[in-house]
Amino acid sequence: MEPLSKAKQKWIRSLQLKKNRDLESLFVVEGEKSVLEGLSVFAVHLEMLVSLETFVEQIPHQFHTVTFTVTAKELEQISELKTPNKCLAVFRRPETALLTDRFTIVLDGIQDPGNMGTILRLADWFGVKQLVCSKDTVDCYNPKVIQSSMGAIYRIPVHYTDLVTYLEQTPQPKFAAMLNGKPYKEVVYPENGILIMGNEGKGVRPEILDLTDIPVTIPRFGEAESLNVATATAILLAEMIQ
């Protein structure tokens, strides 16, 4: 182990920008729990670790060769968190193939990192093996997404693509969440279905709805105007995956 150089500090800070994460195919994870989980299930993709000296003893010995130490002030300067934890890790992004004929969540223009992270966590809970997203959906490697995914980012592959082309090319049955669809409990769902969730304010785009087999809705019994997209995703997944 050695102290983290100024150059490496600057480099880690640069990964706060999506364009730099994309360019280097890397992402940053912060916080003791998330980092240690990554070392357990994602170690093959580890690029480097940064730790306070007081936390080093909790890092497994085999990772010490790629561990750099920092002061609390230095960690604060390279951290995205308002209150930095004791360590962070830089991981390489895995290369994963797009799965066919498997249940898939499609996200059309989701913008809020918290929603994206929660949907990743839901996918992990319900055993969904991938997310497919429009190119304008929030970056899954956004630090706030990673924090709210609670480790799901390590297990759920996320693909960004042109959704019209993707949906045109897959024969899987497609179900889009919307306000004026068929009540979701009246629908029979196949094991290989696609659940399409739309933008928080605008919903699913018309060109995507045109490629949908059945629009589904969660009936409203109260006065709320709409449901949070992550909440709606949870309700629909609980029905679709039995």
What kind of feature is each model-predicted range?
Residues 1-54, 137-138:
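Boundary-proximal intrinsically disordered activation/regulatory segments immediately upstream
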Residues 67-92:
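Glycine/small-residue-rich loop that forms an oxyanion/phosphate-binding "nest" at active or ligand-binding sites
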Residues 176-224:
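Active-site/ligand-binding-proximal alpha/beta "capping" segment
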Residues 124-126, 137-154, 206-242:
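Structured adenosyl-cofactor binding patch, chiefly the S-adenosyl-L-methionine
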Residues 33-35, 55-56, 74, 137-138, ...:
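Alpha-helix capping/helix-boundary segments
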Residues 1-2, 68-71, 156-164:
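Short acidic-hydrophobic, aromatic-tinged amphipathic segments that line or gate anion-handling sites
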Residues 95-181:
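RNA substrate-binding interface of SAM-dependent RNA methyltransferases
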Residues 62-73, 102, 172-174, 188-194, ...:
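Active-site regions of enzymes building and remodeling cell-envelope glycoconjugates
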